[in-house]
């Protein structure tokens, strides 16, 4: 089972800032998604789970769920995606979260056209 490779991550503060400033922002019930073209062949994911979400255990669980959804659904090749989770994300099944991820990504794609 492939993991979450280093090349699939948004890692630098400058990259996050560019995505926040110039990317497309779409709100969903479980998270907010930012999307920006990266010029690469593969998509990259960044997760911004702040202390507002909860303690370390809660934040790590949210990040694990998001990474798993991204790993299973490589739907955005050529884009950097940053997800800011909400508390509601933790009360959702993985299947429902995948559906929400796909829907939010489609909504962001419609906004670029």
Language-model segments: residues:
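Positively charged, solvent-exposed patches that mediate nucleic-acid binding
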Residues: 1-113
